């Protein structure tokens, strides 16, 4: 199980590089993944020390990429992240879940939003699962999700086969309509 929390701790004295290798990456994989995540210059710094919001998210995702969890839990991945980093967070989460290179035209980057129509991309090919807790849903532009559930006052109040339908319903009519069954009835 791999977990990305809203505010990860700083770990002074442990370099990000060492942490990634503890998670299971080889030195070469560590360098390559750090470049993908824009963190190559951070590898020899203490884990999360002095990192911005976006850097924290990227650091956590880098650790999760090395860990290769069977179950990925993301708690508000958009929290404290600018638009540019949301795209990177989403692509990294998608890579963790599917762990597939693009396979098209010599691309060796993680399969991500810019190459989702790649011939070899199949979001259902992975045996990995994920749970994403989100309030704004921006992450759904990058991570294909199969179901949406709304937890409201401790009760699972709305369930749908299409997360984008639920998000659209909430955006247009608010949580109240969804909680009262509007999203389940196909209201958008």
Which residues does each predicted region cover?
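Conserved beta-strand-loop-alpha-helix hinge in the C-terminal portion
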Residues: 142, 147, 151-181
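Walker B catalytic motif
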Residues: 76-77, 82-84
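Hydrophobic anchor residue at the start of the ABC signature
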Residues: 60-61, 81
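Helical segment within the ABC ATPase nucleotide-binding domain
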Residues: 86-126
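Conserved ABC ATPase "signature" region
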Residues: 28-46
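ABC ATPase nucleotide-binding domain signature region
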Residues: 1-28, 135
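Conserved catalytic motifs of ABC-family nucleotide-binding domains
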Residues: 68
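ABC ATPase C-loop
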Residues: 64-65
């Amino acid at each position: 199980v791999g977990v990305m929390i809203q505010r990860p701790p700083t770990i002074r004295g442990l370099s990000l590089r060492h942490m990634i290798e503890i998670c299971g990456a080889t030195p070469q994989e560590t360098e390559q993944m750090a470049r993908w995540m824009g963190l190559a210059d951070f590898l020899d710094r203490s884990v999360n020390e002095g990192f911005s919001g976006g850097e924290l998210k990227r650091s956590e995702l880098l650790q999760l990429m090395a860990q290769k969890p069977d179950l990925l839990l993301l708690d508000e991945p958009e929290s404290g992240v600018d638009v540019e980093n949301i795209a990177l967070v989403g692509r990294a989460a998608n890579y963790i879940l599917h762990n597939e290179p693009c396979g098209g035209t010599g691309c060796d980057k993680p399969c991500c939003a810019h190459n989702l129509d790649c011939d070899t991309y199949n979001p259902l090919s992975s045996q990995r699962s994920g749970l994403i807790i989100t309030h704004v849903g921006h992450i759904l532009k990058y991570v294909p999700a199969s179901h949406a559930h709304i937890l409201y006052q401790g009760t699972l109040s709305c369930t749908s086969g299409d997360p984008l339908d639920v998000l659209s319903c909430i955006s247009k009519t608010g949580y109240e309509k969804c909680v009262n069954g509007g999203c389940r009835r196909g209201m958008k």
